[in-house]
Regions:
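Core catalytic lobe of class I
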Residues: 1-175
C-alpha cells in the first residue's frame, strides 16, 4: 500500500521528518511538487508561492505503481532530439511517441478555483486531475482508497469514477 500526504510551505519540512519516523525513511518513494499558476498581488514583497508538496510513502516493497496509466506526452524538443534510430542517444530503438513518459516529480495541475466547474468552494479542495493521477498510478479497480481528511469529498468522488472502493472521514462539519 501507499500513503500520500499533502502539505504547503509552512509545515512540509517538519512533516517529512515526522513521516520518516512513522513510516521509515526506507519507505519514502517520492516528494511530488504540485505547482499551479495564480495571479500575484501587484505589491507583494516576495516570490509568488505557487506550489505545494505531496509526500509518497510505501508500506513495503510490494507497493503498486502503474506508470502506463499516467503517461504524458513528451514535449516537441525531446521528440526532435531523441528520434528513433538516432545513434548515441540511448533511445536508438525506442519510439518516444508510443505511450509517452512517466511524469516527473513536479506536476503542473490547475487548482480547483472558485471559477472552475468542479469547485465546491471548499477552501482546501484539490483538483480532480491531481487525485486522478495519484489513484491511477497506485491502485487498480476495486482497490480501496482512503482519505481521512476528505473535506470536499473530491478524492472519494474520483475514486468512485475510477471504480475504486473508498473510505472517507473528516473532523469538519462541512465534510
Amino acid at each position: 500500500g501507499s500513503i500520500f500526504v499533502h502539505s504547503d510551505y509552512r509545515v512540509s519540512y517538519l512533516l517529512r521528518q515526522v513521516l520518516n519516523e512513522i513510516f521509515g525513511e526506507e519507505n519514502f518513494v517520492n516528494e511530488i511538487i504540485w505547482t499551479y499558476q495564480r495571479p500575484a498581488a501587484p505589491n507583494q514583497q516576495f516570490f509568488s508561492r505557487v506550489h505545494d508538496t505531496i509526500f509518497w510513502f510505501k508500506k513495503s516493497n510490494n507497493y503498486k505503481f502503474y506508470p502506463d496509466q499516467i503517461r504524458v506526452p513528451h514535449d516537441k524538443k525531446t521528440l526532435d532530439n531523441f528520434k528513433k534510430g538516432l545513434k548515441g542517444s540511448g533511445f536508438g530503438d525506442t519510439d518516444l511517441n508510443v505511450g509517452g513518459k512517466i511524469p516527473e516529480d513536479w506536476w503542473l495541475i490547475a487548482p480547483a478555483y472558485k471559477s472552475t466547474k468542479e469547485t465546491l468552494k471548499y477552501p482546501t479542495q484539490k483538483p480532480e486531475k491531481l487525485l486522478e493521477r495519484i489513484i491511477l498510478a497506485t491502485t487498480e479497480e476495486n482497490d480501496i482508497v482512503a482519505d481521512f481528511f476528505c473535506g470536499s469529498g473530491t478524492t472519494l468522488a474520483v475514486a468512485e469514477k475510477l471504480n475504486r472502493k473508498w473510505i472517507g472521514s473528516d473532523l469538519g462539519k462541512f465534510a
